[in-house]
């Protein structure tokens, strides 16, 4: 498995911060995964709910009884490092950190982002983010839409990577 396959071609994924609360990123990501027809297993992670959008939820990735290829992290930035530690202990090699609150608000956030980068490198993980739009794979074999752009992308065989959320969202919309 290549380093990009960990992110773009997962057979299972956890949404850390999955939610039943409407109009939250954790809720929107869950809905998009289902609506776009993700072909793998989805494990909602939320310590307060036993079920998210009709799926069994787990308090932590460590409680999931199956292997997980990738984690989409949509929790408060101050909890992200702990979530990354748990992902490492679970053997998850690909993470997408949608959470904001890293270097964009200032020095404290920049330090938090530096710690995240160090952990990702130490653990040998592939990471997209933090503070990103998410990831999409339009290949019908995977049908992965773990982002919060306005519209669902057309299925097909074109790849696209964008550092800019505005540009990426514009292309997807």
What is the role of each PLM region?
Residues 1-173:
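Catalytic-core regions of core metabolic enzymes
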């Amino acid at each position: 498995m290549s380093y990009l396959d960990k992110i773009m071609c997962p057979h299972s994924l956890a949404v850390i911060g999955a939610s039943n609360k409407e109009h939250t990123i954790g809720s929107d990501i869950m809905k998009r995964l289902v609506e776009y027809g993700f072909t793998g297993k989805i494990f909602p992670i939320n310590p307060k709910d036993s079920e998210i959008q009709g799926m069994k939820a787990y308090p932590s990735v460590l409680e999931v009884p199956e292997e997980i290829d990738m984690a989409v992290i949509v929790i408060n930035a101050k909890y992200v490092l702990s979530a990354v530690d748990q992902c490492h202990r679970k053997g998850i090699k690909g993470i997408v950190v949608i959470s904001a609150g890293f270097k964009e608000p200032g020095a404290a956030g920049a330090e938090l982002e530096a710690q995240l980068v160090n952990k990702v490198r130490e653990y040998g993980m592939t990471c997209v983010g933090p503070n990103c739009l998410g990831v999409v794979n339009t290949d019908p074999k995977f049908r992965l839409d773990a982002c919060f752009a306005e519209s669902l992308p057309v299925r097909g065989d074109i790849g696209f990577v964008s550092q800019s959320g505005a540009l990426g969202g514009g292309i997807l919309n």
